[in-house]
């Protein structure tokens, strides 16, 4: 994938600063356009990655019970306003035939999917779909909780408001007891 054009971003940020009545040449702002460009390169790093590659290596274990990695911190940028949203993801799956992934791989998939202009709903669904396709588990459950700056610093101005999304696949969709177990473990400290 081609690299992010930092100079083009810096030029655009300079135009934005001028459009809001600022002087992009003043001391505090002189380097801001390139700082923003470097920040975008970092926060949009997921655009250059295929998150599914994290599941290219699967381990065959004698484990067919629930696997849950909870409180995976993530951040993303709202594609509607280009302001951050951030929170935690809880990712659970039920291995099939002992097929398990390294635990860090679940967090890496969340990071790669999040680091692009995005919607929380799409992150949640994409993580679940990648896991279903690559791990071939009996089921997947992804729950994400996030605070969106587009609701905190503008518009309705409601700091502290959390948005919760879920994607439920396979056994978790059909088994209330299994789904309840995941929810109880997420709440448990």
From Swiss-Prot:
Main enzyme class: hydrolase
Species assigned in the record: Listeria monocytogenes serotype 4b (strain CLIP80459)
Cross-referenced Gene3D superfamilies: 1.10.286.10, 3.30.1130.10
Keyword Metal-binding: yes
InterPro entries found in the cross-reference section: GTP-CH-I_C/QueF, GTP-CH-I_N, GTP_CycHdrlase_I, GTP_CycHdrlase_I_CS, GTP_CycHdrlase_I_dom
Keywords assigned by UniProt, alphabetized: GTP-binding, Hydrolase, Metal-binding, Nucleotide-binding, One-carbon metabolism, Zinc
Entries under PANTHER family matching the protein: GTP CYCLOHYDROLASE 1, GTP CYCLOHYDROLASE I
Assembly and oligomerization: Homomer.
Gene expressing this chain: folE
GO BP terms, alphabetized: one-carbon metabolic process; tetrahydrobiopterin biosynthetic process; tetrahydrofolate biosynthetic process
One of the record's GO molecular function terms: GTP cyclohydrolase I activity
Positions bound to Zn(2+): 78, 81, 150
Catalytic activity, as annotated: GTP + H2O = 7,8-dihydroneopterin 3'-triphosphate + formate + H(+)
Pathway stated in the Swiss-Prot or TrEMBL entry: Cofactor biosynthesis; 7,8-dihydroneopterin triphosphate biosynthesis; 7,8-dihydroneopterin triphosphate from GTP: step 1/1
Family: Belongs to the GTP cyclohydrolase I family.
Protein name: GTP cyclohydrolase 1
Enzyme Commission designation: 3.5.4.16
One GO CC term, this protein: cytoplasm
Keyword Ribosomal protein recorded: no
């Amino acid at each position: 994938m081609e690299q992010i054009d930092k100079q083009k971003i810096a030029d655009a940020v300079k135009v934005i600063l001028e459009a809001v009545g600022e002087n992009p040449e003043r001391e505090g702002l002189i380097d801001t356009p390139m700082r923003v460009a470097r920040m975008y390169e970092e926060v949009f790093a997921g655009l250059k990655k295929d998150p599914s590659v994290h599941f290219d290596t699967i381990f065959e274990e004698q484990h067919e019970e629930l696997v849950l990695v909870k409180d995976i911190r993530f951040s993303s940028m709202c594609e509607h306003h280009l302001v951050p949203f951030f929170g935690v993801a809880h990712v659970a799956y039920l291995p099939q035939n002992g097929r398990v992934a390294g635990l860090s791989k679940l967090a890496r998939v969340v990071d790669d999917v999040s680091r692009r202009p995005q919607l929380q709903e799409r992150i949640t669904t994409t993580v679940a779909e990648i896991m279903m396709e690559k791990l071939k588990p009996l089921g997947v459950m992804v729950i994400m909780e996030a605070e969106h700056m587009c609701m905190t610093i503008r518009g309705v101005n409601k700091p502290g408001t959390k948005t919760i999304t879920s994607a439920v696949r396979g056994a978790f969709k059909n088994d209330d007891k299994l789904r309840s177990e995941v929810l109880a473990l997420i709440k448990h400290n």
